[in-house]
Amino acid sequence: MRRPRHKTGITLAALGALWASAVCADIPAARQTELMHLLTQDCGSCHGLTRKGGLGPALTQAALAGKPAVMLREVILHGRPGTPMPPWKSFLNEQEADWLVQVLLEGKTDAH
């Protein structure tokens, strides 16, 4: 029996909301502020301070729409060999990378 598409979409949205709340729940506010600074300054040095692109591609909500969160986390942590995108795993753990992915996918511009 096939599941109606709208129910699948609702289920995926609910799972995404649960994932997002779980990611935020365990990162202290002070670290979230540090991560936003890293996103703005370090990532922004290549992707643009407003995330609209530069040396690296845009990191806007629209530009990342449809990209799997797991893939984005892997790029953040491990970089992209053969490109200027460096790995950030020395500075971030998986949970922090997931938090950054959430911020990017939601188009947030501040930590809170």
Regions found by a protein language model. Name each.
Residues L39-L49, L100-L104:
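The canonical Cys-X-X-Cys-His
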Residues W19-L38, H112:
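Electrostatic cytochrome c docking/interface patches
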Residues A25-A29, T50-A62:
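His/Cys-centered metal/cofactor-coordination and adjacent catalytic loops
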Residues Q41, P57, T83:
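Glycine-centered loop/turn positions within well-structured domains
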Residues M1-H6:
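N-terminal secretory signal peptides that target proteins for export/translocation
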Residues K52-G53, E106-H112:
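Inter-heme linker and motif-flanking segments adjacent to c-type heme-binding CXXCH motifs
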Residues T11-A20:
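Bacterial N-terminal signal peptides
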Residues Q61-T109:
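Extracytoplasmic electron-transfer domains, predominantly the class I c-type cytochrome c fold
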